[in-house]
Amino acid sequence: VIREETLTIGTVNASLCSPRDVFIRSLQAGASAVLVMHNHPSGDPSPSGEDIRLTRRLSEVGDLLEIPLLDHIIVGDRCYYSMKEAGQLQISKR
């Protein structure tokens, strides 16, 4: 890990994050890969439709920039959901 950053602070049920925000900071840090994490204050780490869409978009942009998205982890109450472990994230083999 070369850098940990808070990109946004959301409300109880929403947060806005764009691939642009993620990858600008990744490029500035000279990152070779990215891991994204956020929490669900409800305690249920199940991904929302927006979480899944964001993961797909981050993966697409990461592939274009050759900075792969390693995982998108959602933290709940004493549990987590890994998009990679759930098979919702395909890591590009470059």
Predicted regions mapped to residue ranges:
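Active-site-proximal loop/helix of nucleotide/amide-processing enzymes and allied scaffolds
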Residues: T8-R94
